[in-house]
């Protein structure tokens, strides 16, 4: 019997050598497969890059189309104004006018006349031809402005650089030196003038623009009001709540009697004896990174306004009937939100109540603080005819533009009126603030008074250098670090060098928070007027009330310096 063949298990049979088990490797096939895979990968990457480029091109073309549409709207508006001017010119010729009217833009930027006779420039709308007429000093000139007063005034100081250059005082001299020594600084702001004991035009206009936009809101929400408009609503609401005055229903009524309303509010703030100041409570450190509320509902933390003096005074008066502070003591259960009634009548239904959307409340309170600083500086100020100690000499700065016929010289004010308390502030309100706000209602408070912004920033810097209180052991502080300009230069670098939107928002937020802190420190001092006057005198060279007045509006006090 033949012995049975031994059968191996399948696992062993699989691994046992056999001519049937082999692997054939085709080198050409592998090379072709690798080539096809590489080609497919390159095509996929090229398609992705093409899609990204197409998206970027689509976005760029969209931006260009929006710019072209805006430019077309501007051209159409200019054509409409030209058509209206032509119609008026033809109508004037039809009535027997011998010569065509002269365009205001072809004359000198200064027009002369009695300041009180025209209320600061031909009414709130400004002069003809789209120009704005403003008057700053009772015995000074009336300025005809096309776009921005500071830019046009400063630009006119560099027309005779072969003879003299403007010098702006110790603060700006130190700022210029610090800017020229920095490694990271916009190249377009550096010039030879900065090394001639002066400051270049581009650097001055750039820095003044940063100061003027310190309180400008960069949010595009329709619920936002400019800080000045929010302050006007708060001021009018408080005045109407405490007096029999009717609620304003138009923007013109909102601007009426601003000097009286400011005086009324400041008088109540002086009578308030509570242990409060003008600061906000930042219980959440993240709130220091943004001006807008962290809460998406638009409200800050419950204790955010808890120690703010102005909010407490307004809240105790019943301006915010929905707050817990007034709910317990309100005598009228049906109390109205008087601020909302004003915003609804003047600005429309898109603006929610301030106590609900609290960004408007915060910016409005700080704008009121800035106006209070202006009021304090000008409350007892009066313009003297003696100019010996005066730094700002308009005849020397403006030259032939300052000359006018003797028949057009302004008549002097009555002494009793000029020495009246609050006269200069009332004059500035009627002849500067009201025309500018009527022409451009969205103007921020920092653009109206950049000098007040500088006062607050200097106060905050002195407090930081003095360990938080502004006091030093020697009684006199000399700051050689140059850190006071860091935040201003940071905004300039983000705008012109890095061009980073998020970085720019962060820099503007840091500057605004410093401004808020400085306003609180300045208004909390025993004598804010003394502190403000000292800053104007030591840092910017101010000599009298006339200099203080122009400093608040210009943000600088230039003098002529001969070129050697």
Swiss-Prot record:
Record-level GO BP terms: symbiont entry into host cell; viral genome packaging; viral penetration into host nucleus
Keyword Transcription regulation: no
Alphabetical UniProt keywords: Capsid protein, Host nucleus, Host-virus interaction, Viral genome packaging, Viral penetration into host nucleus, Viral release from host cell, Virion, Virus entry into host cell
Interaction with major capsid protein/MCP as annotated region, ranges: 1-45
Top-level lineage group: Viruses
Pfam families cross-referenced by the UniProt entry: Herpes_UL25
Start-end of Gly residues biased regions: 118-131
Localization terms from the record: Virion; Host nucleus
One GO cellular component term noted in the UniProt record for this chain: host cell
Coiled coil: none
Region (Disordered) location: 91-133
Assembly with partners or alone: Heterodimerizes with CVC1. Interacts with major capsid protein/MCP and triplex capsid protein 1/TRX1 at the pentamer vertices. Interacts with the large tegument protein/LTP.
Family named by the database record: Belongs to the herpesviridae CVC2 protein family.
Name this polypeptide is given: Capsid vertex component 2
């Amino acid at each position: 019997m033949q012995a049975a063949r031994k059968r191996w298990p399948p696992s062993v049979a699989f691994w046992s050598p056999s001519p049937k088990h082999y692997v054939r490797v085709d080198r050409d096939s592998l090379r072709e497969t690798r080539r096809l895979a590489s080609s497919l990968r390159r095509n996929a990457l090229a398609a992705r890059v093409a899609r990204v480029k197409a998206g970027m091109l689509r976005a760029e073309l969209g931006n260009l189309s929006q710019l072209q549409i805006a430019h077309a709207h501007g051209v159409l508006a200019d054509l409409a104004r030209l058509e209206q001017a032509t119609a008026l010119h033809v109508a004037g010729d039809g009535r027997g006018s011998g010569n065509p009217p002269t365009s205001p833009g072809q004359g000198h930027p200064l027009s002369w006349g009695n300041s009180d006779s025209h209320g600061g420039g031909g009414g709130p709308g400004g002069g003809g031809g789209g120009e704005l007429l403003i008057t700053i000093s009772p015995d000074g000139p009336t300025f005809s402005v096309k776009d921005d007063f500071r830019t046009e005034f400063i630009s006119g100081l560099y027309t005779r650089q072969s003879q003299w250059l403007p010098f702006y005082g110790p603060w700006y001299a130190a700022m210029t030196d610090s800017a020229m020594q920095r490694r990271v600084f916009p190249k377009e702001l550096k010039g030879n003038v900065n090394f001639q004991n002066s400051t270049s035009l581009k650097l001055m206009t750039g820095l003044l623009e940063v100061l003027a936009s310190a309180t400008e809101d960069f949010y595009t929400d329709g619920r936002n009001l400019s800080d000045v408009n929010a302050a006007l609503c708060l001021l009018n609401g408080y005045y109407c709540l405490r007096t029999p005055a009717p609620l304003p229903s138009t923007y013109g009524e909102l601007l009426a009697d601003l000097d009286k309303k400011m005086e009324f509010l400041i008088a109540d703030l002086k009578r308030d004896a509570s242990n409060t100041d003008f600061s906000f409570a930042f219980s959440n450190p993240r709130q220091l990174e943004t001006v807008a509320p962290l809460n998406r509902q638009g409200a800050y933390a419950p204790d955010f306004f808890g120690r703010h003096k102005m909010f407490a005074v307004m809240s105790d008066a019943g301006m915010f009937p929905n707050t817990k502070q007034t709910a317990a003591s309100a005598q009228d259960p049906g109390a109205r939100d008087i601020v909302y009634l004003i915003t609804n009548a003047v600005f429309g239904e898109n603006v929610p109540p301030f106590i609900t959307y609290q960004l408007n409340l915060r910016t409005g309170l700080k704008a009121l603080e800035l106006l209070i600083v202006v009021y304090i500086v000008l409350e007892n100020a009066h313009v003297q005819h003696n100019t010996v100690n005066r730094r700002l000499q308009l005849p020397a700065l403006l030259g032939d533009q300052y000359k006018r016929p003797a028949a057009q010289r302004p008549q002097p004010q009555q002494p009793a009126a000029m020495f009246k308390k609050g006269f200069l502030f009332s004059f500035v309100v009627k002849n500067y603030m009201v025309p500018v706000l009527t022409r451009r209602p969205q103007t921020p408070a920092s653009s109206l008074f950049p000098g007040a912004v500088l006062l607050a920033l200097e106060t905050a810097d002195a407090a930081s250098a003095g360990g938080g209180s502004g006091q030093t052991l020697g009684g006199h502080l000399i700051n050689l670090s140059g850190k006071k300009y860091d935040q201003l230069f940071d905004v300039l670098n983000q705008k012109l060098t890095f061009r980073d939107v998020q970085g720019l928002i962060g820099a503007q937020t840091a500057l605004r928070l410093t401004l808020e802190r400085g306003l609180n420190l300045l208004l909390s001092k025993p004598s804010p007027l003394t502190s403000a006057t000292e800053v104007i005198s030591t840092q910017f060279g101010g000599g009298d009330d006339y200099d203080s007045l122009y400093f608040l509006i210009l943000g600088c006090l230039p003098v002529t310096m001969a070129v050697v």
